[in-house]
Amino acid sequence: MATGSIPFVLIHGLVISSLYMIPLAERMAEEHEVHALDLPGFGQSEGPSEVLTIPELAEWVIAWMTAMGIEQCHLVANSLGCEVCAQLAVEAPERVVTLTLIGPTIDPKAHAFGVQVARLLRDSLREPFRLRLNWTFDFFRAGLRRAIGTTRAMFRYYIEQQLPQIAAPTLLMRGENDSTEPQSAALAMTQLLVRGRLVVIAGAPHCVHYTNPREVWEAIQDHVQRHSA
């Protein structure tokens, strides 16, 4: 199967819709089929009344791929979405050709709720105003109960336990100024991957795919081409 025939599936982060994936998706769409999903209960996707766990969100993405007739894809995720995609890559390795984790949460050495919330708030000040406005709108659309419940689900998930089980070649990417995932955490996560590589985008925050879509897309293209034989 040619590289160009394998679609890209983009999964958003915590309490935000897929809208902030558009700058990256637009660059991808010049040559590839691209799908930017809204997870259940976020953005334009209706969700169940209960809050879904990370494994349940991964199952939902797998079911969506099956319904869409997508047998394999290049998975790209940010923040919370990295946990969902890591779980998916372990549960259904045959569906994932390559995996790109942008600003994965959570720092394996800092699972404490207060520590992570403080880091998220600190990073939010480095994000563009338009993105913060987008997040605020999506927060209220998702609702307080789902926002808090999903945040708790993210903190209770230990991505470091899944990383060694991922067979797909994995690109881990972070913005240099991302306070939610220090360089030490990114290096530790990369070392847990069987086929992992780390790329750092200079001067960028947590949502580096939004602020630096060109650099992120170039890194993803290089990653895909390395494993397109």
Which role fits each region the language model picked out?
Residues P55-C73:
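Conserved acidic catalytic loop of the alpha/beta-hydrolase fold
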Residues T190-C207:
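Catalytic histidine neighborhood in serine/cysteine hydrolases
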Residues I166, L172-R174:
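Short beta-strand/loop motif that positions the catalytic acidic residue
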Residues A204-W217:
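Catalytic histidine-centered segment of alpha/beta-hydrolase-like enzymes
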Residues M1-Q44:
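Conserved HGGG/HGGXW glycine-rich cap/lid loop of the alpha/beta-hydrolase fold
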Residues N177-E181:
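Acidic catalytic loop of the alpha/beta-hydrolase fold
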Residues L133-Q161:
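Hydrophobic, aromatic-rich cap/lid helix
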Residues E83-E91, R95-E127:
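Flexible "cap/lid" loop of the alpha/beta hydrolase fold
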